[in-house]
Amino acid sequence: MSERLIQLAANLKKVLGKRIQSVEIALGEVTVVVYADTYFESAMLMRDDPSLAFEQLIDLCGVDYQDFRDGAWAGQRFGVVSHLLSLEHNWRLRVRVFAPDDSYPLVASVSPVWNSANWFEREAFDLYGILFDGHDDLRRILTDYGFIGHPFRKDFPISGNVEMRYDPELKRVIYQPVTIEAREITPRIVREEQYGGPV
């Protein structure tokens, strides 16, 4: 295990203290899980404390842990995972926070801490339905305005609920219930003497 990773984990424990739920070093990476009620405060400390200096948020995404590891997941269903970079110390860090209520997933927004989180949080809201408290423009970013549901949730129907198509008679786009027709696909058989052989 790298001394640098051990030092990073020690610095995290020292700076964040009881805000940390767990710290893990695995596969050459440090992952810290913070409590939802201390998420924003922890983000400020990780950015501003000179022993950490994570001045850049590289990525933020939502995760639906329903049926994770074949249903063996016992924790909260929705999580937010961020990847941070410290240019000063050349450290990378994965930060994970879980929404305490599965029926109303809500965590603090870190877009006031790192501006780059703005669109990432909108994407997590759009695709997973995770709400970010304090986000100043939380609206859909990838799906259509009239879209119902959140398509990356594991309980979202694979076929969707409605389909959109252009109606040439009305000369506009319309929505209609999904129509799926069962069809049988017959594989094509290739019969060539030289198929797969030397050229």
From Swiss-Prot:
It is found in: Cell inner membrane. One of its GO terms (cellular component) is plasma membrane. PROSITE patterns: COMPLEX1_30K. The keyword NAD applies. It catalyses: a quinone + NADH + 5 H(+)(in) = a quinol + NAD(+) + 4 H(+)(out). SUPFAM superfamilies: Nqo5-like (SSF143243). It is an enzyme of class 7 (translocase). NDH-1 shuttles electrons from NADH, via FMN and iron-sulfur (Fe-S) centers, to quinones in the respiratory chain. The immediate electron acceptor for the enzyme in this species is believed to be ubiquinone. Couples the redox reaction to proton translocation (for every two electrons transferred, four hydrogen ions are translocated across the cytoplasmic membrane), and thus conserves the redox energy in a proton gradient. NDH-1 is composed of 14 different subunits. Subunits NuoB, C, D, E, F, and G constitute the peripheral sector of the complex. This is NADH-quinone oxidoreductase subunit C. It comes from Polynucleobacter necessarius subsp. necessarius (strain STIR1). The lineage of its organism: Bacteria, Pseudomonadati, Pseudomonadota, Betaproteobacteria, Burkholderiales.
